[in-house]
Amino acid sequence: MPKSLENTNETPKSFFITTLGCPKNTVDSMAMHQSLLKEGLLPAAGPEASDFHLVNTCTFIQDATKETIQTILDSIDIKKQNKQKLVVVGCFAERAGKEISDDLPEVDLHFGTGKYDKAGEILRKNFPLEFKDLTEFNEDLLERLTTSKGIENYSKPYSYVKISDGCNRGCHFCIIPNLRGKYRDTDSNDVLEQTKLAVKAGSKEICLVSQDTVFYGKDTDKLMDLVRSVAAVEGLEILRLLYLYPDKKTEKLLDLYREIPKIAPYLESPLQHVSKSVLKSMNRTGDYEFFKSLFQKARDIRPDLEIRTSFILGFPGETMEDVEEIIRFVEDVKPEKVNLFPYSPQEGTKGATMDGQLKDKEIARRVNLVREAYLGTLKTIHQNRIGKIYPCVVDEVLDDGAIVRRLQDAPEIDEVVYVETKDLKLGQFGKVRVDSFYELDMSGTWVD
């Protein structure tokens, strides 16, 4: 009979997960976390204290790949000091498994995407002597451990719940379908179960994520039904929808923003460009006028809503006229949050083989032109926030105050407000008055 953690004096092995990349990777790390617990491992306070250090990687763009490689090298240095097993998982492992095997012998094991919930089984199979025979966890204990340390950014007042994996869009700049495969829905019952578990563990905000949220069920009505079900979970305060592809499905989905007050006043819709010719080259739909209309509809439905979008500069064939069209859009529509990416050709994508490739220096120049335009509009946006009071949540408690986040801002990626009020609690809801701003973040006063 396998032993239970609560009826043995043996000390089980421990693990720590370092997570790189987007919130979708955080969800995958959570799946690994639960799988490792079920196999008898316990979470460690940091990689140095772990017996197994897992690095969940990202390789979406060139900068992400560089960060992944550096993190692996840093983890190898940690391993030399502490002798733990180093396991590289996720997108980079999927893409560069042979290179990891050939060039990084210090990596004890690597595996790609689609196996996160089997991480414990994979480690047990590959390192049988490292495992204690601990598999029968008390259910209450397992829930407590699931929300404890052992994974970066896990113990927060918000949680991410992934509703699908993979993508069918086929954007010519994107490597994701090669790494994660075709689009696959997560069963709605599993989405609800994950939401309930997160709320029970203390999360007040749930962020629904995927590579393509509006593709869920291949039918907007099914997605809307799912959103309604998640919003109805008892104890949930805020529901945030992320990664909404800018098309007619998103336009229809906006009706839920009027129907369900729990949905955060926040629209994240990555446009990637506004020039019709560049979008066509990217194998994407839409144009300047449709995007402008979409964002205006969102603001009409929820006047307190703020918009986050992203643009890729320097895609093959892009002209300065195309860049100027993005600048005009930023200055005309004034999305509150703009993320800019320099195009980097990804092996295995159509974009990498297209004519009209631009030099890195020219791409950087174009990024800077759009950034300057955005920072100009952001200054005006910030000035209009001064003196206004916003609902907010405490994301981090500091010695001399706290970091709070308006509901118009998503966790980890958007602006925060620094307040000097003490005795606030993590996850506490209240209101903040914006008093001043920096380039991106703000400072304010807790008023509730």
UniProtKB/Swiss-Prot annotation:
It is found in: Cytoplasm. It catalyses: L-aspartate(89)-[ribosomal protein uS12]-hydrogen + (sulfur carrier)-SH + AH2 + 2 S-adenosyl-L-methionine = 3-methylsulfanyl-L-aspartate(89)-[ribosomal protein uS12]-hydrogen + (sulfur carrier)-H + 5'-deoxyadenosine + L-methionine + A + S-adenosyl-L-homocysteine + 2 H(+). Keywords: 4Fe-4S, Cytoplasm, Iron, Iron-sulfur, Metal-binding, S-adenosyl-L-methionine, Transferase. Residues 13-128 form the MTTase N-terminal domain. Residues 383-448 form the TRAM domain. Its EC number is 2.8.4.4. [4Fe-4S] cluster 2 binds at residues 167, 171, 174. [4Fe-4S] cluster 1 binds at residues 22, 58, 91. Transmembrane segments: none annotated. It comes from the Bacteria. Catalyzes the methylthiolation of an aspartic acid residue of ribosomal protein uS12. This is Ribosomal protein uS12 methylthiotransferase RimO. The lineage of its organism: Bacteria, Pseudomonadati, Spirochaetota, Spirochaetia, Leptospirales.
